[in-house]
Amino acid sequence: MYELNNFESIKIALASPEKIRQWSKGEVKKPETINYRTLKPEKEGLFCEKIFGPTKDWECHCGKYKRVRYKGVVCDRCGVEVTKSKVRRERMGHIELAAPVSHIWYFKGIPSRMGLLLDMSPRSLEKVLYFAAYIVIDPGETGLTEKQVLTEKEYSEAIEKYGSGSFKAGMGAESVKKLLENIDLEELYKDLRSKLKESTGQKRIRTIRRLEVVDAFKHSGNKPEWMILDVIPVIPPELRPMVQLDGGRFATSDLNDLYRRVINRNNRLKRLLDLGAPDIIVRNEKRMLQEAVDALIDNGRRGKPVTGPGNRPLKSLSDMLKGKQGRFRQNLLGKRVDYSGRSVIVVGPELKFYQCGLPKKMALELFKPFVMKKLVEDNHAHNIKSAKRMVEKVKPEVWDVLEEVIREHPVLLNRAPTLHRLGIQAFEPVLVEGKAIKLHPLVCTAYNADFDGDQMAVHVPLSVEAQAEARFLMLAPNNILAPKDGQPITTPTQDMILGSYYLTIEQEGVQGEGMIFKDHDEMLMAYANKAVHLHARVKVRRKLHPEDKGRLVESTVGRFIFNEEIPQNLGFVDRKKDPYALEVDFLCDKKALGKVIDKCFRKHGNTITAIMLDYIKKTGFRYSTQGAITIAVGDMEVPKEKGELISLAEEKVDKYEKAFRRGLISDEERYEKVIETWSETTEKVTEALMATLGSMNNMFIMAHSGARGSKNQIRQLGGMRGLMANATGKTVEIPIKANFREGLTVLEYFISTHGARKGLADTALRTADSGYLTRRLVDVSQDVIIREIDCGSQEGSNIKALKDGNEVIEELYDRIVGRYTLEEVIHPETGEVMIGKNEMILEDMAEEICALGIESVKIRSALKCQTRHGVCAHCYGRNLATGEAVKVGEAVGIIAAQSIGEPGTQLTMRTFHTGGVAGADITQGLPRVEELFEARKPKGLAIISELSGTVKVVETKKKREVIVTDEHGESNTYTIPYGSRMKVRDGEFVELGDEITDGSVNPHDILRIKDVAGVQNYIIKEVQRVYRLQGVDINDKHIEVIVRQMLNKVKIEEAGDTNLLPGSLETIFKYEEENARTIAAGGEPADGKPVLLGITKASLATESFLSAASFQETTRVLTEAAIKGKEDHLIGLKENVIIGKLIPAGTGLKRYKNIALNTEEVAQEEIEDTIEEIVEENL
């Protein structure tokens, strides 16, 4: 066996017959499996112990040798080696075939590799392989040609004409094998290379395809005849098990059935050959053997699949690898682990931010080995066995030991679906009674958890290293910021916001207004004795230190209480001018709390922020309870103006109806006007309602503070529900005039059910689509890791605010903060350098840049990074989750994929109907994001200008045309289809690639017309537009990482003197290296153009075959990799997970591999140094 961390790469190739025999421990000759009486494997059968090893540890088949002392002895009676039964998982057998058969992957795949090598169509090849036609192997002196396919009739005619010995022709895989053996790869390669220079069109494409296959065989050392099998490997029996069920029957893996068919047919064929049976019978048997082997390798690839009982297709070797239940995704990429449990979660408001409540029973089971070891150490038990018994009987001393064991031993909590890395965090367990896990309310946002029956899983990090990583990297207080936008994700929600808002409200004319207190405690006492109201403005003397005389500060009682544990130097108050004022002297709604937490984190870091968060949680819950803010039907007052507004609208609608009937306006116009009228009316009713509700109305407080509900929902409760959409998403022109306070009529209720159901169906679809999008994004970007500090790139992006027309999608501030500059940023007025070259732009600098009106800044960008297999820290910028520069080893690709995929569920699924004009529906929401990342041609294409120049609009009765003329007098004419909306006016100047009509642009056109930078900016802008429209903030750099992966390939147009093949895709780095090498040798470099690949294509085009195979199209990827003899250098993360190595990111990087922990000595030295320092200071 290989030592896991000792090999650097894994290679895949075709197996030669010699290799298969070398793997094998013996030939399987009989189709028998297990003897039904003795239940022992049959000799020379599919489960034979002589070939595959003993079924019981250290025991041979006949029972002559038992016990471990005979280890390695081969029994002289039954021939079984005495060893562990585990070898039945790794020992292989083989079947010697009586006639060669072709391997279906290489004959039937698209394109057919065998067909390309022999230059035959797959159809004629199939006829030969399945004994329906003859193929000429050696034409001799006859008029036939090599590889000519003859029918039965033509063959007999040729024999009559030329005589039986004059030429050689045959059928089946044997003949194909002879032809493959005859191929001279070197000659064929040279021949195809010269043909390539002359051919064009379809012929050229075919030649390129053949050249690819020939090149693959030539370089990999595979021989073409190995695509034909003389001998078949039999996989170890434990991987195709046979188990006895209760009723004495057996359940067996489908593979055994498939192997049995192969063995039966093979044995029959051997017998027929020995008997010298007639040709036609032998031929039929050979065909059946070929079909049996096909079914074993890939059932259902050709013809009807072989079915088992109940017409279920049998699972072949290929099916074992494919799909979600296949070997890759089920067992290699995700495994079930020990030391884990799951239970329902309940809220634990009394917990500290870094704690979670773990049920006692669960903790005892999870920490069993630790408890047992500790019991022995503390002399409660003599040995491990008795300790185990104690734990199982749950003796009282076990609980005390458990308390000790779990102290400072973090556990991981995970909630499925884990959409981003905050779906798994570490906490210190606190033992609780009952069976439910207790969760801190502030981490719910990150987990997207609520307490309506959600379940969570617990995992125990076992090794010291794992515990250290859990504590330093995954503990909840270390994950305060969300990686997608760097904003705090642990902001209080619901009750906590409500309490904080209620606490910081200011009211006039309430009890105790204007009172003056000597200190904070006196004010609290007055409040406790109901002498002063929580919302009253009072004056309190504040002191900075005990000796300070202090100063009277005016604010409300609630705000004094709120500020108790909030650091007083967050930057809301200028402390130089006013050292005594309250830091948070404003109404605290959701946004304000977010700001407070953000400033606290940037200024004081994790620990202080965690303490402050716990305080806000505690006071929030307390005062939302004391405030007793509830809602009842009475809180919803229907505005008096409502009736009047509705009757006005009805009159308007009647007027439009009459105008339509008289033919003054079209139905389309009438519909638009009716919708507009009702929308306006709904708005007016809402405004009236908001004016009716006072600022102290409970419903208003809940919505205004951001705790729960929105203006829209209040409108439905107390205003009017307004317009609803029907099943197709078109707005129904009959509005719902009532609200929930008044109650709906039957018709109104019926109209509103459409939209409600569509919403539910949408959500379900969206979740699945969003998950699949995330999976593809992760796959394309999983090997993007920060590899170095600075790649030294001199290129970057010129960043402006993202605009769509006049509407700002993303401000300049958001786009530059936390990035490195490419050039110096100069002050526009003074001309001095504000930020040097290659420096990070911090918040205050970014604010200053925006304040000075600087419109564009040149920054380093991941799109232009020169690092291979990843990006460098300077091109990436700040790690949003920590707020500091990103470290080498950070898996930024996966973070990018998660940041884009996780909010995907919030995006809508809708297609926006342009009121039926020209039928151009504009895709929005999730499908639009998918369309962009898959680089598909969008629906509703816009016409774009292929020149920079002046526009002239020509309109005739029949058509509209736009003519663009550039400065050299060249012009392009674009016909505008009827119903399209134009974006340009006569005499306007358009840039290359600008849109002439409304709609979406095909990204491939932008790449063709503009350049790589143009298409990069387009995708970033469009993706940002979709997310920002839904109120989701994602940082540009995440999209940049994905776009970089979509554009890192070049399509070779002309190969020149390089080793590259025309028409093939190569990474930009390989292309540049190969060209540099060729130019240095004095040759002609290759010519290639950049291509934009969708994320699925880009994932499959990755250099790692393991990663691609585990993603999609497993058999196709493996077929290609085997022929090319590909080597996987295990650079990305997936490959290493599959192999079972540590991933090469974070602490799994090579540079951290051989670090030895020398803790005790170092700690001792440090303690001594510290003592010396203290002594010196005090002397």
Curated annotation (Swiss-Prot):
SUPFAM superfamilies: beta and beta-prime subunits of DNA dependent RNA-polymerase. It comes from Alkaliphilus oremlandii (strain OhILAs). Zn(2+) 1 binds at residues 60, 62, 75, 78. Keywords: DNA-directed RNA polymerase, Magnesium, Metal-binding, Nucleotidyltransferase, Transcription, Transferase, Zinc. Mg(2+) binds at residues 450, 452, 454. This is DNA-directed RNA polymerase subunit beta'. Binds 1 Mg(2+) ion per subunit. Binds 2 Zn(2+) ions per subunit. GO terms for molecular function: DNA binding; DNA-directed RNA polymerase activity; magnesium ion binding; zinc ion binding. GO terms for biological process: DNA-templated transcription. It comes from the Bacteria. DNA-dependent RNA polymerase catalyzes the transcription of DNA into RNA using the four ribonucleoside triphosphates as substrates. Its cofactor is Mg(2+); Zn(2+).
